[in-house]
């Protein structure tokens, strides 16, 4: 259910993969020990593809059980792989790093505060969730300043009461402050989780792990 891991020595595991309840999207050639840990700890099928030819899957993909929101620069070959598992929404225009700018689960999608309203509404309709434009800890790239599963939402330790209230008005889940990798507030860069388990970056401290377990309901 739990553990810490790196990816070829890099603890920023959330940059290179995106996890859902049933699948984990990881770039081809990712270390076997990394993909095996995701499959084992999170009980997911591994889906292997690049996005726009890049390995930074976590930065370029968001979504939930309803669908995937993907950079509009993804290739037809990459989209063919993804479409075997979900419907796919292409995020076009200059603000297209979906994983960086969308924090989503099956209850809500929080998006970059400067995202065009019509685009945000399209994403909400596609994912079948309400949408809120906000910052977390003053950071606009909410997909990396927070991490959401269907059991809780972990947010940047400097997130203020107003930012948290904006989420609480929409979603009835535990929302807590936390960090990863020895103090990084960009929790999405160092965490992969679903309702069944989690893995955190290899330098995440015991205190940080305890906070992750509390917010996501893994304390026994």
From Swiss-Prot:
<dbReference type="GO" id="GO:0003743">
    <property type="term" value="F:translation initiation factor activity"/>
</dbReference>
<dbReference type="GO" id="GO:0043022">
    <property type="term" value="F:ribosome binding"/>
</dbReference>
<comment type="similarity">
    <text>Belongs to the eIF-6 family.</text>
</comment>
<dbReference type="InterPro" id="IPR002769">
    <property type="entry name" value="eIF6"/>
</dbReference>
<protein>
    <recommendedName>
        <fullName>Translation initiation factor 6</fullName>
    </recommendedName>
</protein>
<keyword id="KW-0396">Initiation factor</keyword>
<dbReference type="GO" id="GO:0042256">
    <property type="term" value="P:cytosolic ribosome assembly"/>
</dbReference>
<dbReference type="Pfam" id="PF01912">
    <property type="entry name" value="eIF-6"/>
</dbReference>
<keyword id="KW-0648">Protein biosynthesis</keyword>
<comment type="function">
    <text>Binds to the 50S ribosomal subunit and prevents its association with the 30S ribosomal subunit to form the 70S initiation complex.</text>
</comment>
């Amino acid at each position: 259910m739990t553990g810490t891991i790196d990816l070829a020595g890099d603890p920023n595991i959330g940059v290179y993969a995106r996890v859902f309840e049933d699948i984990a999207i990881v770039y081809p050639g990712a270390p076997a020990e990394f993909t095996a840990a995701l499959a084992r700890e999170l009980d997911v099928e591994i889906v292997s593809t690049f996005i726009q030819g890049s390995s930074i899957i976590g930065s370029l993909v968001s979504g939930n059980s309803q669908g995937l929101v993907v950079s509009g620069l993804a290739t037809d070959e990459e989209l063919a792989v993804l479409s075997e598992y979900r419907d796919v929404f292409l995020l076009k225009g200059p603000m297209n790093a979906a994983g960086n700018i969308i924090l989503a689960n099956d209850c809500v999608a929080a998006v970059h505060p400067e995202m065009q309203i019509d685009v945000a509404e399209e994403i909400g309709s596609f994912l079948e969730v309400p949408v809120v434009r906000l910052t977390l800890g003053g950071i606009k790239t909410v997909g990396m300043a927070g991490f959401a599963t269907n059991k809780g939402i972990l947010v940047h330790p400097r997130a203020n009461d107003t930012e948290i209230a904006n989420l609480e008005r929409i979603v009835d889940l535990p929302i807590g402050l936390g960090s990863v990798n020895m103090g990084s507030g960009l929790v999405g860069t160092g965490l992969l989780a679903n309702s069944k388990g989690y893995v955190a970056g290899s330098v995440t401290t015991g205190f940080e792990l305890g906070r992750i377990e509390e917010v996501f309901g893994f304390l026994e």
